[in-house]
Amino acid sequence: DRSPAMVQLERYLDFSRRVEEAGVEIPLHHCSNSAGIIRMPEANLNIVRAGITIYGIYPSSEVERDIVKLEPVMELKSHVTYVKDVPAGAAISYGGTYVADRKLRVATVPVGYADGYSRQLSNKGWVLIHGQKAPILGRVCMDQFMVDVTEIGDVKKGDEVTLIGRDGDEFIGIEEIGDLCGRFSYEFACDISPRVPRVYIKNGKEI
């Protein structure tokens, strides 16, 4: 229902007219956030505030996807630092919240909540390795977490890990991570900490 937003727009435009009639020039008029840019072009005026759409992410499920085609541009990548076999009955990570029900092959990923990777993904998130899903085992720690690579062949130290983005035919989006955590997907775009290096790619090359 756009009617509340339309009321706000009319009030803004009316106020702007009154101010200008009083002799005050307003060079820039701004109302639209990401959702407004897509759903209310009449509110875009002469400057807009594109936030989450810059990442190629729709602002909410209420925004029609056929108006503007967005493609996610942000990825979060890491690598495997350690791989080992653990026996059935072994507790994994702090607090022993996950106990292996069989022999498992476990890989360590050097990313944690200090990097902005949510602790709420403990025991329910997953990453991509070799284009396959690897479930998170136990708690996400400050600087690392563990994943099950038992069914993924030949995982070794140094292999790429995709936390957000695409690997082969599989994809992990920020929206999906938000759903897993019961949190707003925007948070993950904002939470990635300064200690995580930013790499910008243009035409397939780092810039």
What are these regions (language model features)?
Residues 1-79, 83-87, 153:
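Active-site loop/helix belt of alpha/beta enzymes
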Residues 83-207:
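C-terminal accessory subdomain/extension
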